[in-house]
UniProtKB/Swiss-Prot annotation:
The keyword Ribosomal protein does not apply. This is Major non-capsid protein. It is found in: Host cytoplasm. GO terms for cellular component: host cell cytoplasm. The keyword Transferase does not apply. It comes from Rice stripe virus (isolate T). Pfam families: Tenui_NCP. Coiled coil: none annotated. Induces the formation of large intracellular inclusion body, organized in amorphous and crystalline arrays. Presumably the main cause of the stripe disease observed in host. The lineage of its organism: Viruses, Riboviria, Orthornavirae, Negarnaviricota, Polyploviricotina.
Length: 178
């Protein structure tokens, strides 16, 4: 299998080591009943809404993860951060900036209407300090807010272009919380 490519010219996947059939079987029925197995392997073939549905399903299975020694964790769950990175990158337009951090202040302000009652800049900087439920709420909100948009906006340049890497760093601690 080829390595994951993170450019708009090349489809993302397959992710080495990820058992796509097992991933498909692990997704909640609300997701798996509305997608095909090839949809998981090629984010370019699905709509924005389907990408969001798949990402929500991945957050669900990350939240309900088995022990790290379980075969399911080894074949599926440990690959979820990289898988989400690829799908979110395609959802946002394929231009991905792995080398820079999101603008925490701008992102914090963007989250105020939905998560302002509890989110702090400290949580955004250190996602491992959030509870399992808080991480899930943040990931769900990112998916809800995500959309392909013009690349010439401040929000795109400072937040969304860098979001796939940030999302990956947030979902990772979720896999290790009980």
């Amino acid at each position: 299998m080829q390595d994951v490519q993170r450019t708009i010219e090349v489809s993302v996947g397959p992710i080495v080591g990820l058992d796509y059939t097992l991933l498909y079987d692990t997704l909640p029925e609300t997701v798996s009943d509305n997608i095909t197995l090839p949809d998981l392997k090629d984010p370019e073939r699905v709509t924005e809404d389907t990408k969001k549905l798949i990402l929500k399903g991945c957050v669900y299975i990350a939240y309900h993860h088995p022990l790290e020694t379980d075969t399911l964790f080894i074949k599926v769950h440990k690959h979820i951060p990289e898988f989400c990175h690829s799908f979110l990158s395609h959802l946002l337009g394929g231009e991905d900036d792995d080398n820079a951090l999101i603008d925490i202040g701008l992102f914090f302000n963007m989250l105020q209407p939905s998560l302002g009652g509890w989110i702090t800049k400290n949580f955004l900087r250190h996602p491992n300090r959030m509870s399992k439920d808080q991480i899930k709420m943040l990931l769900d909100q990112i998916i809800k807010m995500a959309k392909a948009e013009s690349s010439d906006t401040e929000e795109y340049e400072k937040v969304w272009k860098k979001m796939p890497t940030y999302f990956e760093s947030i979902i990772q601690p979720l896999l290790h919380k009980t």
